[in-house]
Amino acid sequence: MTSTHIYYAERTDVESIYEMAIEYKNVDLADANYPDIDRGKLIHFINTMMKKGKIILMRDLDKDKLIGCCMFNKSEYFFSKSEIMQIQIVYIKKDYRNFKLVKTLIDSVKRQADGLPIVLSITSGLGIDPVFEKLGFKNMGSNWRFV
């Protein structure tokens, strides 16, 4: 079993997070017909998430390798001033994926949410709805894209 370490991202982690996002796009989103990654925009997004939200990283201690991340921030419903916690990205590298590691990341978000509703939009097409249902999320609809 892999020994993992969960921690908050720091400025020194930006390049590693960027590389993980590239892998996510190239491996899991390869068939999704998404546009190419713009390095400047993605780096800006990562920095913005570190300023206005949180980035939780997961590292394989045995291999000293970044294996997962979750980016999230407080937001509001578009129709209300009531706050929500919005998960922007939750990702674990393919070889490491299991329910326990996903639960660990989501539990970290729950602790930060302090009772706020947590909203997660899935746009990968990976068919992992049952995992999030098992974690207590309720399916409130679907993401649709016209290409």
Task: Write out the residue ranges for each language-model feature.
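A short beta-loop-alpha structural element at the N-terminal edge
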Residues: S3-E19
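Conserved GNAT-fold acetyl-CoA-binding loop/helix
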Residues: K25-H44
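A short, internal acetyl-CoA/4′-phosphopantetheine-binding micro-motif in the GNAT/acyltransferase core
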Residues: I87-N98
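Conserved acyl-CoA
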Residues: T104-P117
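Conserved beta-strand-loop-alpha-helix junction that forms the acyl-donor binding cleft
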Residues: V109, V119-P130, V147
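A conserved beta-turn-beta hairpin within the catalytic core of GNAT-like acetyltransferases
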Residues: E76-I87
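A short helix-loop-beta-strand connector motif used in the catalytic cores of GNAT acetyltransferases and
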Residues: H44-L57
